Amino acid sequence: MRSLAVAIAIACSVVASGVAQEGAAPQRAPDVIFVPTPPDVVDAMLKLAKVTSSDVVYDLGSGDGRIPIAAAKTYGARGVGIDIDPERVREATANARSNGVADKVTFLNEDLFTANISPATVVTLYLSGPVNARLAGKLMRDLKPGTRIVSHAFDLGDWKPLQTVTVSGRPIYFWIVPPAPRR
């Protein structure tokens, strides 16, 4: 019986260490349900942001990972997906492997409101109006001037987009983080 308990303890620690590598699991429910971005919208978002191989594309609420994976496959960019749902993180990680871009794309099980997004040169979003509005301040504070932001379907509240395009009847909004105001 004791050896069974030891075996269970070892198995649990192995599983726990694998989850820890994906990021500290947030302790709250997702703000939005996962709805995949259609492929033509993914393509349009990355084109609108003018993604290149020197970019680091962060997808907040990355779901199955399709946006960072497309950025890596199509443009050679590095990608980081952040999602609060550990099942989505596992799915996205498997999708990156099956698409041959696991060396360029990372998925983190983190809360998008507390995650470090400062390395991003491009940020993509498909969340909701209220979540985007709450996120706008973090984007302005944490991102470097010149970082491009692209959102599918929802704007950033009072922060007016520089450009809006429509693809298959779906709006896509584009912003560039401005220089910090002088004091």
Where are the language model's segments positioned?
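Conserved class I S-adenosyl-L-methionine
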Residues: 54-63
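A short SAM/SAH-binding and catalytic strip from SAM-dependent methyltransferases
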Residues: 117-134
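Conserved SAM-binding motif I beta-strand of class I
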Residues: 78-83
